[in-house]
Amino acid sequence: VLEDNITTTSLVLVPRQIKDKEKVAKDLSDILGTSYEDMLAHVSKKTSIERVHPEGRRLSYETSDKINALNYDGVYLLKESKRYYPYKELLSHTLGYVGIDNQGLSGLELIYDEYLKGEDGSIKYFSDGKGNRLEMAQVYENPTDGITIGLTIDLNLQKAVEGALDEIVSKYTPEHALILAMDPQSGEILAMGSRPGFDPNNYKDYDTETINRNLPIWMTYEPGSTFKIITLASSIEEKTIDLFKDTFTDSGSINVEGATLHCWKHGGHGTQTYLEVVENSCNPGFVSMGQKLGTQKLMSYIKSFGFGKKTGIDLNGESNGILFNINKMGPVETATTAFGQGIS
């Protein structure tokens, strides 16, 4: 269970039932650590029921016991549910967090708020002019539980991802880090995490940017060499290369319209088959693949693989990604796109 509800208590006042308003205000303000003037305003309200926000919401057991011990008329403790995240920072950006009334504010909490929150129960009864409950018929409506949502997340893998992120941050102190693990057959997300992270149990302790930016979803970045598989798959499908028979000679760089694009290996890989181009992750070799495909076909396959548009994942903040405008692409843009640069 990645998140659950726990029972907590909140302070509710019935001002008409409170006889010594000054004393009640003094004692409650002392217990809650709020000002006497503010509490006196609460107990003096001309309302049938008064909630004390936010000091009187989701009280600790110790605070609740102190209020109970006062045994004042018109002072009640109402049981409420509070969302609890037992794993704290684990998967926090994906799960999201809720506000004081358990309304979803980000992540899955926001997307599925309507289904998770359920419906409150209620008791309807008659009272006299002083707010005293009358012994007459009452109507009780049962509460309805929210649904339980199952995720594709592998908890053990997620724990490994969180540990790896912490190690990366400790070793390299980057501004941010992110890891995403996906099932290549189904597209299901198996693990996803980023740093900086936050504990949704105490989300108010963090700045807005930290708690609301789910970096694997929100951020755009160049895929780099991981993108080469797209160029390779497109070339195989179009039969523009023979992996085993065709060769490419890498001198360490390739000139495209006056632009020099370098291989990661100084001096290059020499003559190699295109299978070896793949094995060596040779940038000039992939430029050659892109040239053989041509701009139109390369971009067509890139779009068919889903780049440049949202996946439709059920998380807020997903970006479209960025592609070159095909009508403005020249040989250099085609070349860099072929090995994963200039695309995000």
Language model: regions and residue ranges:
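Solvent-exposed coil/turn segments that connect beta secondary-structure elements
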Residues: I6-T7, V14-I18, R58, E80-K82, ...
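A short, polar/charged loop-to-alpha-helix boundary motif
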Residues: T8-A25, G197-R213
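Envelope-exposed proteins and targeting segments
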Residues: T7-L11, D73, K88-H93, L108, ...
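Short N-terminal helix-loop-first-beta-strand/juxtamembrane motif that initiates sensory/input modules
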Residues: D73-L77, S170-P184
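Conserved, well-ordered alpha-helix/loop/beta-strand core segments that scaffold catalytic motifs
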Residues: L134-A177
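Small/polar-residue-rich segments within soluble enzyme cores
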Residues: I6, E22-D30, A41-G146, G340
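Extracytoplasmic/secreted envelope proteins and their assembly/folding machinery
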Residues: T8, K21-S29, S64, N68, ...
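Beta-lactam-recognizing serine transpeptidase/beta-lactamase-like catalytic domain environment
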Residues: D128-Q138, I179-S225, I230-S344
